[in-house]
A protein has these predicted regions:
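Beta-strand-rich binding-surface signature
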Residues: 59-64, 109-116, 135, 143-145, ...
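Hydrophobic, mid-to-C-terminal alpha-helical segments
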Residues: 126-132, 142, 185-313
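Metal-dependent phosphate/diphosphate-handling catalytic cores characterized by acidic Asp/Glu clusters
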Residues: 1-113, 119-125, 129, 150-180, ...
Length: 313
């Protein structure tokens, strides 16, 4: 079946697209279809060119994917978009391709909102109209799925260590045992991942009903990660002593840097202070003024100056 580049058609006011990721295992091609949804309803896309809705559907729960785009690929990577017994394709970058393979279910369809696929990246007008709607998209998602990337720099150790940090019966031992210095170093390396420097993430996390953090084949709940980072921050001076006493780090107490300056620490603080939520995690109000939010977000990166404003509206 010959594949053609997919052509998004214009969205109507109040609509956005979702990616229906088809089940498969291992190295099988990434296959999907795009559906159009509005508040409270979703519609099938009967034409890959016109996106004309055919029938209303009960809203399917979806996850919003939060990730870094990464550099352009030297080798062409694509995801298949299936419609009307024809196969189309959209070029994707390596980090997204890796994320989709890791998150894909072997036996059931899953719905995702992914900016690179659900927004026509070749249409500036559509991007301008969809960006202000991101707060609605993230608020409606049943979960935000955070993709940090593949395993490297002992990240698997770090992901497991997060769970250990939340065991209060052994936490003090972790803070004072020199044998744990490598685990603290692995956690610090995880906290330096590029994802934690994106300005958009503050909005994405603050708006999330639930969020999970994924790295390789490991995952933890966002709140567990946030709690572990807060504990790490509160004990950083004691933990730095471990590195002073550890021959594995050449008695180098400054290996960790200042934990409070790491993007992950700033994100945990920022995302907790932007909104007040109800008991069921619904957004109630801003806790900070626009000026205060702008100042708080100044440490996070944005590729376009306008993104700073969009990220907090």
């Amino acid at each position: 079946m010959k594949e053609f580049d997919y052509k998004h058609s214009p969205l109507r006011e109040g609509q956005f697209r979702l990616l229906n990721l088809h089940p498969a295992r291992g190295s099988a091609d990434l296959e999907s279809n795009l559906v159009v949804r509005s508040l409270g309803t979703a519609v099938d896309s009967t034409s890959p060119i016109l996106d004309q809705p055919s029938r209303a559907l009960n809203p399917e729960p979806y996850r919003a994917l939060s990730y870094t785009w990464g550099p352009p690929c030297q080798n062409d990577l694509f995801i298949k978009i299936l419609a009307d017994s024809r196969a189309f394709r959209i070029a994707i970058r390596l980090n997204l391709e890796t994320a989709l393979r890791q998150l894909r279910s072997p036996d059931r369809e899953q719905f995702f909102w992914i900016d690179a696929l659900c927004i026509n990246q070749k249409n500036d007008d559509e991007k301008s109209s969809q960006i202000p709607e991101m707060w609605r998209i993230y608020t409606q998602a049943f979960s935000v799925c955070i993709w940090l990337g593949i395993h490297e720099d002992e990240s698997a150790t770090a992901m497991e260590f997060i769970k250990d940090c939340l065991d209060f019966e052994i936490f003090e031992q972790l803070v004072h045992d020199t044998q744990t210095s490598k685990k603290w170093a692995a956690l610090a390396a995880l906290m330096r991942r590029p994802w934690f420097s994106r300005r958009w993430i503050v909005q994405e996390i603050a708006l999330a009903r639930e969020a999970t953090l994924h790295c390789g084949d490991k995952q933890v709940e966002w709140q567990d990660f946030a709690d572990a980072i807060s504990l790490f921050h509160s004990k950083q001076h004691e933990i730095r002593k471990l590195f002073r006493e550890s021959t594995a780090f050449h008695n180098h107490p400054d290996y960790l840097d200042d934990v409070s300056e790491l993007g992950a620490t700033r994100l945990v603080e920022a995302s907790a202070n932007i909104f007040r939520k109800s008991d069921d995690n619904q957004i109630m109000k801003h806790l900070l003024s626009l000026e205060a939010l702008m100042s708080m977000l100044s440490t996070f990166e944005a590729s376009d100056p306008h993104d700073t404003v969009y990220a907090i509206l």
